[in-house]
Amino acid sequence: MFRNVKELIEITKEKQILISDVMIAQEMEVTEKTKEDIFQQMDHNLSVMEAAVQKGLEGVTSQTGLTGGDAVKLQAYIRSGKSLSGPLILDAVSKAVATNEVNAAMGTICATPTAGSAGVVPGTLFAVKEKLNPTREQMIRFLFTAGAFGFVVANNASISGAAGGCQAEVGSASGMAAAAIVEMAGGTPEQSAEAMAITLKNMLGLVCDPVAGLVEVPCVKRNAMGASNAMIAADMALAGITSRIPCDEVIDAMYKIGQTMPTALRETGQGGLAATPTGRELEKKIFGGALGSRETTSAN
């Protein structure tokens, strides 16, 4: 079993296998299930993600009315041919938004690694699918690779907004996606680690400040940024660009930053955007009562 990214990469070198292979082997060891059973479960997760993306692209709106319809707008904008950032990145962004809009509308999603950050991995996966035309097995392996890096973060830092801010949720998801994109594109395990490091460095310090304590504002749009961040970081790593700070040290830095982050900025809905005049008005409109007094339990 690997405990950090360094050990993960060492295993791939020693055995001449992919990161996804290492994660699959670990799952087999821990769960005592066959490879076929593990693939079947991950295939189910993939199907859930695919359905969520499709539903979101058809258009959904949350019960509060705070979020919904933006994925549809983005797809229309892509078709217009006017996009500045290019169709592939915007496709990833729109599919990330689609997933989180479904989550906000009480639909079914697959937490990657949390519900609040569930759009980044499927958003990038189904966008890259259009360019690389992967097999179903390669798409499933994408999820195992992402999971390997998520496993390291969860065991050495945090994937919880309440513990580490949004950097721990969307930041982790973005890094996981970047690493998986690299493997799917034919990059090396070392490049996957570089992609994770580059991605996460750019999310450090991101707070968790959900308006009204709901996983809507700014969570949905942060998934959009997480998806675009992952795509850019993956390209940088594939181009041979490296992080001066090793991946494990970046993860440790994220953990320490989260430990020093004020409680008001860790999912409580007491600070940041949640505490703005508009944020408080939206909270009052949705829930009524004294502003800022409601105990929040939703993840960012």
UniProtKB/Swiss-Prot annotation:
InterPro entries: Fe-S_L-Ser (IPR051318), Ser_deHydtase-like_asu (IPR005130), Ser_deHydtase_asu (IPR004642)
Keyword terms: 4Fe-4S, Gluconeogenesis, Iron, Iron-sulfur, Lyase, Metal-binding
Pathway this chain belongs to: Carbohydrate biosynthesis; gluconeogenesis
Lineage of source species: Bacteria, Bacillati, Bacillota, Bacilli, Bacillales
Keyword 4Fe-4S: yes
Species in which this protein is naturally found: Bacillus subtilis (strain 168)
Molecular function via GO: 4 iron, 4 sulfur cluster binding; L-serine ammonia-lyase activity; metal ion binding
Record protein name field: Probable L-serine dehydratase, alpha chain
Keyword Ribosomal protein listed: no
EC main group: lyase
Transmembrane stretches, start-end: none
Cofactor: record remark: Binds 1 [4Fe-4S] cluster.
Family annotation (NCBIfam families): sda_alpha
Cofactor: [4Fe-4S] cluster
Subunit structure: Heterodimer of an alpha chain and a beta chain.
Protein encoded by which gene: sdaAA
